[in-house]
């Protein structure tokens, strides 16, 4: 159903014109080198980095999924939206090692620290993860939103946006992606903030909302008996997924690799950590508002997945609806562009360049563009398949990530802290962990064909949070045992890539890159997170 008026369409068209203009400007500015195309010539400041990190994270699955999940399950999935502390870990722990190694990709860093086999394996895992956990979900959710907002045929709208996003990504590389992302982040956040404000006014204010929503929906720490989100499971598993996503995933870390220097990269992550606090309120809280308005009889909410667009349709005035439409277009285009560029970088640097070391700069850029075009086509091919995904896209996304994250998070985290860990341990941990994770996902998909009570059925239906924890511990055990059972890594594999092997000169340079303000701002982020946890717990509003 179409509910945008002429004024709304003016906002949508103006937004698209601005994005097109920025893309053309960045394309003309591009220098046609791999450093420029894939890492924006390593010349970006903290504001663009921070805004781009958030824009890369916030996709249409957030708009459709998070608000819908809040309307259905309450605030418990807010754990994943309060990962600002993990973003700080990226800036304070991992960024110095990544920048000193001057790598283009995360698999390349893994080769520096371990061996080429680890690099190749991580490349394959990351490319698979982009298909099953990022691009496909984003395309499906974005197409759904596009249909509900603009009244355009579901598949037609998806194809148009996927192609438009692919064109400016192919032509402009990371320059086009990051500068348009900075704009899109602002549009998306402001539009969603306006919706939350109007929603609170409609429901009667914050206190009225807290009274209208049952206490169990306001509790972020559900009982251990909860079948989906027991507090112990989500409290431990959520940071594991966060470490993988924020600290080792190509399409997030790539923003930091494009920084002018370590100071700009770290401050970009601090800025992103502040921005990351906002989705909890502007995406999750509207879901609670939709639940409350439905309970009050003010809106009709037959499908919780439609919570966000139903609110826009019901309570937003003409004109501002266009702002939200622009924000949702921004979310879809930003996430897809980020995935396209990350996949292009992974393929070109970690696969093509390894087999064609003599390739020129222009040839690599050309291959990158071709790779992006292929990814665009694969994304379009996935659209019909996404119709088979059950409701609850956000839940699906988190469960898939819980099966992919543990071994990679273990290898990266322990790899920078302990120099004794070697390539054999890292490779074994990732191979075994990946096989177990994919086995869990496959059996879960076909669980209805398994005999209830059997081992395989029990394995398939195991809570995804607990499975994530078990797999993380098991991956660490494999990593440590195999490493200690084999010779230590050669010195060149650890020099400057672990805390104990960082030379004094690098330590001094890293220390000079931050000051008391950086520390104070980071502490403020942590205090805000703890305050939110306390408020939405049995000690606070849910008590």
Map each language-model feature to its residues:
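Membrane-embedded helix-loop-helix hairpins and adjacent transmembrane boundary segments
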Residues: 1-543
């Amino acid at each position: 159903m179409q509910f945008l008026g002429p004024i709304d369409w003016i906002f949508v068209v103006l937004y698209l014109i601005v994005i097109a203009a920025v893309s053309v400007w960045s394309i003309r500015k591009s220098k046609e080198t791999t450093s420029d195309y894939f890492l924006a010539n390593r010349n970006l400041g903290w504001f663009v980095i921070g805004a781009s990190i958030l824009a890369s994270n916030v996709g249409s699955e957030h708009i459709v999924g998070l608000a819908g999940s809040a309307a259905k399950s309450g605030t418990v999935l807010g754990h994943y939206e309060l990962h600002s502390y993990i973003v700080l870990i990226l800036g304070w722990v991992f960024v110095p090692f990544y920048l000193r190694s001057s790598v283009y990709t995360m698999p390349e860093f893994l080769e520096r620290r371990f061996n080429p086999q680890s690099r190749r394996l991580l490349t394959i895992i990351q490319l698979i993860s982009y298909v099953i956990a990022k691009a496909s979900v984003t395309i499906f959710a974005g197409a759904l939103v596009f249909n509900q907002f603009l009244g355009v045929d579901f598949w037609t709208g998806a194809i148009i946006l996927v192609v438009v996003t692919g064109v400016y990504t192919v032509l402009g590389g990371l320059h086009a992606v990051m500068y348009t992302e900075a704009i899109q982040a602002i549009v998306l956040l402001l539009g969603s903030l306006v919706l939350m404000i109007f929603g609170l006014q409609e429901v009667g204010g914050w206190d009225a909302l807290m009274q209208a929503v049952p206490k169990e929906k306001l509790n972020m720490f559900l009982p251990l008996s909860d079948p989906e989100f027991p507090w112990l499971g989500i409290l431990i598993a959520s940071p594991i997924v966060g470490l993988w996503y924020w600290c080792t995933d190509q399409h997030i870390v790539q923003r930091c690799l494009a920084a002018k220097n370590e100071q700009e990269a770290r401050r970009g992550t601090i800025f992103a950590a502040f921005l990351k606090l906002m989705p909890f309120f502007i995406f999750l809280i509207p879901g609670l508002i939709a639940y409350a308005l439905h309970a009050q009889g003010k809106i009709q909410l037959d499908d919780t997945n439609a919570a966000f667009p139903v609110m826009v349709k019901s309570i937003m005035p003409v004109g501002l609806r266009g702002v939200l439409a622009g924000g949702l277009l921004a979310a879809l285009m930003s996430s897809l562009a980020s995935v396209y560029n990350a996949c292009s970088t992974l393929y070109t640097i970690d696969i093509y360049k390894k087999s064609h070391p003599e390739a020129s700069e222009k040839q690599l850029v050309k291959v990158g563009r071709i790779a992006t075009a292929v990814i665009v086509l694969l994304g379009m091919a996935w659209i019909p398949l996404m119709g088979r995904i059950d409701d609850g896209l956000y839940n699906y996304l988190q469960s898939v990530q819980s099966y992919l994250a543990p071994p990679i998070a273990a290898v990266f985290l322990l790899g920078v802290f302990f120099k004794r860990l070697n390539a054999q341990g890292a490779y074994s941990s990732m191979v075994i962990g990946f096989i177990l994770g994919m086995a869990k996902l496959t059996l879960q998909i076909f669980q209805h064909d398994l005999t209830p009570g059997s081992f395989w059925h029990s394995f398939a239906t195991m809570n995804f949070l607990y499975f994530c924890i078990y797999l993380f511990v098991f991956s660490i055990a494999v990593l440590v045992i195999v490493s200690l059972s084999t010779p230590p890594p050669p010195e060149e594999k650890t020099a400057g890539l672990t805390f104990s092997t960082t030379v004094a000169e690098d330590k001094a340079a890293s220390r000079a890159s931050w000051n008391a303000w950086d520390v104070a701002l980071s502490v403020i982020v942590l205090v805000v997170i703890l305050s939110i946890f306390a408020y939405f717990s049995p000690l606070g509003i849910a008590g």
